[in-house]
């Protein structure tokens, strides 16, 4: 026989509990030790780019005016991903390119992989969330 414990809570308490459970599930899904495939990173990165980067760098990666392009960028094309990671985490040009530390390790790895493999950037390179986690230390 298994005893059942029922806890009665208010609708507000229940909503808070549901939100906390969603955050726990999201954190597990974004486990920085998970090794992602290139296709999965690119698909996720496309969404991150559209939500956070396209406003300045344009959907086509070409940039506009003083905003530098991502398409064909030496930093993006460089096999040394530490340079692009530093830009993503710290920003550059006195804040013209903002830091994106608030994004998860998975989101940063995904958007970097997307940028490295979109438009004319066909590097075949990928960045794993563990790379971002290490760089944050």
Roles of regions detected by a PLM:
Residues 1-2, 21:
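Terminal connector regions
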């Amino acid at each position: 026989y298994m005893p059942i414990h029922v806890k009665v809570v208010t609708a507000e308490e229940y909503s808070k509990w549901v939100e906390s459970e969603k955050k726990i599930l999201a954190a597990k899904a974004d486990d920085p030790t998970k090794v992602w495939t290139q296709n999965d990173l690119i698909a996720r990165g496309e969404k991150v780019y559209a939500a956070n980067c396209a406003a300045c760098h344009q959907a086509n990666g070409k940039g506009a005016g003083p905003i530098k392009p991502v398409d064909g960028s030496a930093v993006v094309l460089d096999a040394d991903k530490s340079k692009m990671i530093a830009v993503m985490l710290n920003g550059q040009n006195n804040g013209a390119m903002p830091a994106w530390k608030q994004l998860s390790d998975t989101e940063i790895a995904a958007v970097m992989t997307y940028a490295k493999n979109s438009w004319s950037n066909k590097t075949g390179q990928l960045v794993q969330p563990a790379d971002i986690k290490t760089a944050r230390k």
